Amino acid sequence: MVDFGALPPEINSARMYAGPGSASLVAAAKMWDSVASDLFSAASAFQSVVWGLTTGSWIGSSAGLMVAAASPYVAWMSVTAGQAELTAAQVRVAAAAYETAYGLTVPPPVIAENRAELMILIATNLLGQNTPAIAVNEAEYGEMWAQDAAAMFGYAAATATATEALLPFEDAPLITNPGGLLEQAVAVEEAIDTAAANQLMNNVPQALQQLAQPTKSIWPFDQLSELWKAISPHLSPLSNIVSMLNNHVSMTNSGVSMASTLHSMLKGFAPAAAQAVETAAQNGVQAMSSLGSQLGSSLGSSGLGAGVAANLGRAASVGSLSVPQAWAAANQAVTPAARALPLTSLTSAAQTAPGHMLGGLPLGQLTNSGGGFGGVSNALRMPPRAYVMPRVPAAG
């Protein structure tokens, strides 16, 4: 604790006059008054709303819990507002004490003047004539010392009394349950577990009912319908290819049938020619078999496993007929026997014909005019009869 009596008046007066004054204390008192007024207004409004709800539209146990939770907060606001108001009053007391101490404090210029006068008296006191004046000056300085000390002690006592009346502020009470968030999290987790358990209990009977039902088809009707829609656009080109194959097979069968008939006619009197016809027919059948294998490999082993591919305007021509490339290549190796040999003997034609005269082509070449077996008519022509039996009139 500072002993103001031990300090000279120069120090005490300088401290008092060098401070900010009472203006800061007055401003602080006004702010505390404003805080107190706001708290009183908030407490009054809060209390009015609470009582308005509980006495009017909201009645019940939940309303009672709300009042029990809100009442401590309203009380805290009221108490805090009173404390703020008291603080403002005490700050004003301190400001008044300062003004009193300031008025009692000797001004520093007066003290400085006294000290200057003392120095002059001492300097001119050659024969002791200034001794009474020096004593008076020292007495005045002593009074200044005592006055400043009394002012400072009075100010310290007044401010101490003002601060002792103040009460410490308290924190606002909790109006909610601190464990509410934890309890809410636990409740949510329990609700989720309960919902999952309920869903499981609902799904188990459904699963058992599905197991109890007869086994359904692996491919439902709608899936088969979608599969048919995907396949059906490719069936039309496939059917065209099959139709073309059937036409060529029919042509081959017709040619083979004609060759078989010709073979039967020539077998009796021209064995070599018959053998040539049979060989040509077998070659034609082998050519169609090779064509069928090529078509089957292009369509895939399953018939629908590979994509359908087609080209337009790429077929080769044999005469006026459009044929595959293999047939066109084979057609170049065909050498009609009638064009290569004279029409003197079928035996020589059969012996000199190539082994693969048809070269994998349909038997339509057998009907070429002026070639192939066009000379058969000459071989079958009967010589003129040596004797003609006359017709008997009695025979009718």
Curated annotation (Swiss-Prot):
Would you tell me the protein name for this molecule? Uncharacterized PPE family protein PPE19
Q: Name one GO biological process term.
A: response to host immune response
Source organism's superkingdom?
A: Bacteria
InterPro entries, per database record:
PPE_C (IPR022171), PPE_dom (IPR000030), PPE_sf (IPR038332)
* Gene from which this protein is expressed: PPE19
Q: Which SUPFAM superfamilies match?
A: PE/PPE dimer-like
- Write one Pfam family the protein is assigned to: PPE
- What is this organism's lineage? Bacteria, Bacillati, Actinomycetota, Actinomycetes, Mycobacteriales
Family from the record: Belongs to the mycobacterial PPE family.
